[in-house]
Amino acid sequence: MSILKKPDLSDAQLRAKLAKGMGHNMYGEPAWPNDLLYTFPVVILGTITCCIGLALMEPSAIGEAANPFATPLEILPEWYFYPTFNLLRVIPNKLLGVLSMASVPLGLIFVPFIENRNRYQNPWRRPIATTVFLVGTVVTIWLGIGATKSIQDAISLGLF
């Protein structure tokens, strides 16, 4: 069940507005009640059902029991801390490592000011921001992979 409101094109004022491109978003299918009352609950319940179904069909393994008297050879953080862990591990001076991590958000703050002359929405027409994003992504993935390697291969990844 949906409600469809069609424009009254016999109205001269409405036709004049539409000719100028000043039409309202009042035509077609309204958000209330169609989307908010019917579509959104179906999507939300479907997502919850999929999550519960996947959790029941494939529960995650608990793993081996913790032994407080046996320490593993190398302790690794959670996967999302791999790049910062590797950065702190390969930079010999710890203060320099912390400052290098603090310089990342400080550098990102200055990107809009560097590129303030460019008013385009398309990211490929904003070369500085696009380059910073792509280089940052590659460096983060590189450091994340390097955290799982030995300290000798942490930067080169054993490739060269």
Curated annotation (Swiss-Prot):
NCBIfam families: cytb6_f_IV. The 4 large subunits of the cytochrome b6-f complex are cytochrome b6, subunit IV (17 kDa polypeptide, petD), cytochrome f and the Rieske protein, while the 4 small subunits are petG, petL, petM and petN. The complex functions as a dimer. It is found in: Plastid, Chloroplast thylakoid membrane. It comes from the Eukaryota. It holds the Pfam family Cytochrom_B_C. Signal peptide: none annotated. This is Cytochrome b6-f complex subunit 4. Component of the cytochrome b6-f complex, which mediates electron transfer between photosystem II (PSII) and photosystem I (PSI), cyclic electron flow around PSI, and state transitions. Keywords: Chloroplast, Electron transport, Membrane, Photosynthesis, Plastid, Thylakoid, Transmembrane, Transmembrane helix, Transport. InterPro entries: Cyt_b/b6_C, Cyt_b/b6_C_sf, Cyt_b6/f_cplx_suIV, Cytochrome_b_C_euk/bac. CDD domains: cytochrome_b_C. GO terms for cellular component: chloroplast thylakoid membrane. It is a multi-pass membrane protein. PANTHER family: CYTOCHROME B.
